[in-house]
């Protein structure tokens, strides 16, 4: 059962209506926010081979995405703003986990259809492994099921919930492996780039 303390921890990093900029304020801040978002997304993207990318999301990237959606759709009313918050807040890390958007990318449509059929269940074979700790497998698509009975989806939303020991090891400077165990796409990165690891560790502090 979730305690009050856990509830507070799970909401402390969430984006609130009050913390968002007005459309006018965002218009002025947008060039710098966009520049930072591009840089952070580059640092926080882990490529596993040619066709699989994991984009590890954080509070800033989700805040930027919300502000962009409000700008593009010219949303002013409270209900519309809350809809965007409800859509993107689940991808903000809670302090004990990593949240990632997983993308399977094949330029050729025929290749993509074939691959998505062969890679059924791949979203459940994604893992992170902190140095000296057991592998942590992803919880996938907790909002709704994206795969069908014949193929996986090209986009999945993942949560890697870290045991306390793994979190402590990362905060103490341990390395972390990211990988996929699917028999049709066995791939891993033994050591993350320093900038990527440093950025991910900030999700835990």
Give residue ranges: language-model regions:
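Methionine residue identity
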Residues: 1-2
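Long, contiguous binding/interaction regions
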Residues: 8-99, 105-205
